[in-house]
């Protein structure tokens, strides 16, 4: 198989990870106050607390040793606040997941141990020596178990988004994994999202129903919209903004828009700073994907050389270190190697 033939299936496997990274960076934009959420409950809008705590966050970061500096994707930002209940314990609300998702924006830049250390530092910066600190660390371990389980799914859990039955199976599978790994945190973390996905699936079934006329479809879609409580619609607004931004990015990518064109379009909806970060992340991810495909082609040549297992592993490890020079990149490549081996 030629290097070009090797690259195509590899890029298809890598693509969902790039999309996840873009989702994370857009999520950071929303949490940082891109969209107006005035008057909303603080537990739903950690960005409000972040703004109020901006000065103390800056002091905390200045006090960190150089080895604890924020990774590049998080530079210039602050973590969402971890909410507490009236008893001083970690509140079971979606904002806790927002905090972890913020940290996960830097996942591609860090080893697993470094990511754990980053999360532990960010938790300590807010909850040091409080009952909520070990609670937050425990929830992080559960969330990591959930994400690790998703990565073990075929193709990272990617699914045909226009096949209702495939979507239903995927939603049921993810819900089962969330319940198993997160326990009673499954509902605050994913309850609203799962409800939105079920709603979207119901809409898709209506749209694809060939037995209905256009008028009947419109009537049923309107009825479906009316079934959603007003407060639930308001709570879903941030997710809708994120989804709209991701759809916009996907359309721009599909049209082959240049980075400058992408930045110009996203500036209108997300603001100049976030648009620039999205474009930079796209470029970084595209560069990584290209280098991984080149690396995989060279790794295949090593595999075909008939070396002993020890020599093969040593040469592949050296190849990774030579091609992937930034922190965490070689570890990420090794993880993709394991994923690729599992699908063969």
From Swiss-Prot:
Gene Ontology CC, one term: plasma membrane
BP-aspect Gene Ontology terms: lipid catabolic process; protein folding
Alphabetical list of SUPFAM superfamilies matching this protein: Lipase chaperone-like
Keywords: Cell inner membrane, Cell membrane, Chaperone, Lipid degradation, Lipid metabolism, Membrane, Transmembrane, Transmembrane helix
Compartment(s) of residence: Cell inner membrane
GO molecular function, one term: unfolded protein binding
Transmembrane segment boundaries: 13-35
The keyword Methyltransferase appears for this protein: no
Membrane protein topology class: Single-pass membrane protein
Keyword Cell membrane: yes
Family of the protein in this entry: Belongs to the lipase chaperone family.
Reported function: May be involved in the folding of the extracellular lipase during its passage through the periplasm.
Name of the protein this chain belongs to: Lipase chaperone
Source species of the chain: Burkholderia vietnamiensis (strain G4 / LMG 22486) (Burkholderia cepacia (strain R1808))
Organism lineage: Bacteria, Pseudomonadati, Pseudomonadota, Betaproteobacteria, Burkholderiales
Gene name, Swiss-Prot/TrEMBL: lifO
